[in-house]
């Protein structure tokens, strides 16, 4: 298991997919629960631009499954051959090589195919609507993937990652901290972390 963090302005004991789009309302890196390796990033993400009236900010420390070579799609790396094989077997068709060059193309291509989208390969790998993202997340979870992953800094692809967890049943909440953010840039105010007991709400 790995320790990751999730920032939110909501207090809860379990994750619920019904609330997935209540953060920024986007699925830019896929559909699921967004987590990060950096506590300070999670704190920053706790500020909800869609609900600025929420003034309580929380960072959840989570245990999530270990990332292995063939249980995730990485946004800017080639897709593992095992994932391509499992996908082709489940879909009953061969995936074009262009769609396997990086994980984000593969995710979008599969989501678009699952939702009946048509067009050029370039179109199918470059954008996906919310229905396609939801379909891709469900499909990849069913064939054994745990994550969609991408680097926190695009300039450092081998550095810390952010991830989308596909199966909420694999997330274990270890700790919840209430944190304070500076009101201008919404960055963590160091030393403001205060643990919230799971029994207190």
Identify the residue ranges that each predicted region occupies.
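Active-site and NAD+-binding cores of ADP-ribose-processing enzymes
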Residues: 1-28, 36, 46-201
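A generic structural signal for short hydrophobic patches within well-formed alpha-helices
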Residues: 41-42
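Active-site rim elements
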Residues: 32
């Amino acid at each position: 298991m790995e320790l990751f963090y999730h920032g939110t302005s909501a207090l809860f004991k379990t994750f619920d997919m019904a609330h997935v789009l209540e953060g920024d309302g986007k699925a830019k890196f896929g559909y699921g629960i967004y987590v990060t390796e950096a506590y300070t990033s999670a704190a920053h993400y706790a500020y909800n631009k869609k609900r600025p009236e929420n003034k309580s900010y929380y960072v959840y420390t989570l245990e999530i499954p270990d990332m292995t070579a063939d249980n995730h799609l990485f946004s800017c790396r080639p897709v593992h051959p095992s994932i391509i094989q499992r996908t082709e077997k489940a879909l009953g068709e061969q995936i074009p090589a262009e769609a396997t060059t990086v994980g984000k193309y593969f995710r979008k291509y599969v989501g678009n195919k699952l939702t009946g989208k048509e067009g050029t390969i370039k179109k199918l790998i470059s954008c996906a609507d919310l229905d396609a993202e939801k379909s891709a997340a469900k499909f990849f979870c069913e064939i054994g993937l745990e994550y969609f992953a991408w680097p926190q800094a695009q300039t450092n692809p081998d550095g810390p990652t952010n991830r989308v967890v596909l199966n909420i049943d694999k997330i274990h909440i270890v700790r919840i901290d209430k944190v304070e953010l500076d009101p201008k840039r919404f960055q963590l105010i160091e030393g403001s972390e205060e643990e919230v007991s799971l029994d207190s709400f």
